[in-house]
Design a protein with these regions (language model features):
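A charged, aromatic-enriched C-terminal amphipathic alpha-helix characteristic of glycosyltransferases
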Residues: 344-351, 361-393
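Nucleotide-activated donor-binding/catalytic signature segment of Leloir-type glycosyltransferases, i.e.
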Residues: 255, 261-285, 292
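A short helix/loop element that forms part of the nucleotide-sugar donor recognition site in Leloir-type
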Residues: 51-55, 200-214
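N-terminal subdomain of nucleotide-sugar transferases
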Residues: 1-53, 57-59, 96, 238-246
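Nucleotide-sugar-dependent
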Residues: 231, 277, 281-286, 293-313, ...
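Membrane-proximal helix-turn-helix segments that form the acceptor-binding/catalytic region
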Residues: 86-91, 110-114, 124, 130-131, ...
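Carbohydrate-associated surface elements
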Residues: 170, 193
């Protein structure tokens, strides 16, 4: 049996660990002789940590949390945590006979880089293009000490790791440009998977959810996820507004940030928009009420490395999707989904409004079961697990 240690660095507001990674690890363990350990660096409170540990226990995963210092300020506290954690990780590796270490993203990579005389294999989860994402959305400057420190650590890990996993082929291209083509063979793309028994086409859920929402024959747009400047809320509202001019339509928004949505929705659309904040396991129920979904995101440089989780959730539920061009490998994947529309941000909405109207007219007749079946090849837990297993088998 291989003992694999996954090291991650997460804020308290994220649920990637219990919602994405641990279900994939559980699925891998069903068919592979691998025991998963998780060390999560976090500043979450005891309740959140307890919830995550409980989820891990149920999935047969050994979970521990390590605190991230937040004083004297966030940046210095994070650096101090990195500088003082390598011995803790080294001890854990020795005490638990760890064979493979999988650091996810920059800070865990920095910690593992500091371990000398290693006797374990490394699979580096490069996690998209996280440093470039900080440049695009958090104001990180390329000439700053922080950027140079993180980029140096990432480059060292990319070169030293036995294998590197990304979420897109485009991300591999970016990394190869950085470290050289001789390292290409160590790179692989892994999928983000969802439980196809939860995210699935369900006619009963559709009837019940539409009744609960007070819908009859209305065409229902749906969006599930975060809201903010990078998630193209104005474009969603404009597409919806255009559709209401000639159709009886509503827009269901499932988000934890309902306050943001309330502030941005124009008065003339408020009566046609339904805002809800629901638990993650309730999302598929409401998605089944929909007729088309939005998966829009600003296609900045860093977004080449992203695999949109929501896109998979929509497609597994059989929904036609309006998705952004230039986000990870979305364009290549959606070549197999003629029931979806690739939104080109470079030409703006007005230039493609007629194409979108035509797409939406056809969407109501889409074969949802066919969409859901095709989606399993890319977005199911089984597909995600298989993509990891291929790497574990050759490491």
């Amino acid at each position: 049996m291989k003992n694999l240690l996954f090291i991650t660095w997460d804020g308290p507001q994220t649920s990637y660990m219990e919602g994405l990674f641990m279900p994939i690890f559980q699925e891998i363990a069903k068919t592979s002789d691998v025991k998963f350990h998780v060390l999560q660096f976090t500043w979450a409170d005891e309740n959140k940590i307890s919830e995550t540990k409980s989820a891990a226990d149920k999935m047969g995963i050994t979970y521990s949390a390590l605190s991230i210092l937040r004083k004297p300020n966030v940046s210095v506290g994070s650096l101090l945590t990195v500088l003082t954690s390598s011995n803790k990780i080294k001890n854990y590796i020795q005490e638990n006979n760890i064979d493979v270490v999988m650091p996810r993203s920059t800070f865990p990579a920095m910690i593992v880089n500091k371990i000398k005389n290693r006797h374990f294999k490394i699979i580096f989860d490069a996690d998209g293009l996280p440093i470039e994402e900080r440049i695009d959305f958090s104001g990180l400057q390329k000439d700053s000490f922080q950027y140079k420190l993180m980029k140096s650590a990432e480059t060292k890990m990319l070169k030293n790791a036995d294998a590197v996993i990304t979420r897109s082929q485009k991300a591999i291209g970016v990394h190869i440009n950085n470290i050289g083509n001789e390292n290409r063979n160590k790179f692989s793309v892994v999928f983000n998977g969802r439980d196809k028994n939860l995210f699935k086409l369900n006619s009963n859920s559709r009837v019940e959810a539409r009744k609960e929402l007070g819908l009859e024959n209305e065409f229902l747009f749906v969006y599930a996820g975060s809201l903010g400047t990078q998630y193209c809320f104005p474009e969603m509202l404009e597409i919806f507004k255009n559709h209401t001019k000639a159709n009886n339509s509503k827009f269901l928004i499932l988000t934890g940030n309902t306050e943001f949505a309330e502030q941005k929705i124009p008065n003339e659309l408020k009566s046609s928009v339904i805002l809800k904040s629901v638990k993650s396991d309730e999302v598929p129920y409401y998605l089944n009420a929909g007729d088309a979904a939005f998966a829009l995101r600003q296609p900045s440089f860093s977004m080449q490395g992203v695999a949109p989780i929501k896109l998979g959730e929509y497609l597994l539920c059989g929904l036609p999707v309006i998705a952004s061009k230039g986000i990870g490998d979305t364009g290549d994947i959606l070549k197999n989904f003629e029931e979806c529309y690739l939104y080109d941000h470079s030409i703006g909405l007005q230039s493609q409004s007629k194409l979108i109207i035509n797409f939406l007219e056809k969407a109501i007749f889409a074969d949802k079961s066919r969409i859901a079946d095709k989606a399993k090849d890319y977005f199911s837990l089984e597909a995600a697990a298989d993509s990891y297993i291929k790497i574990l088998n050759i490491i």
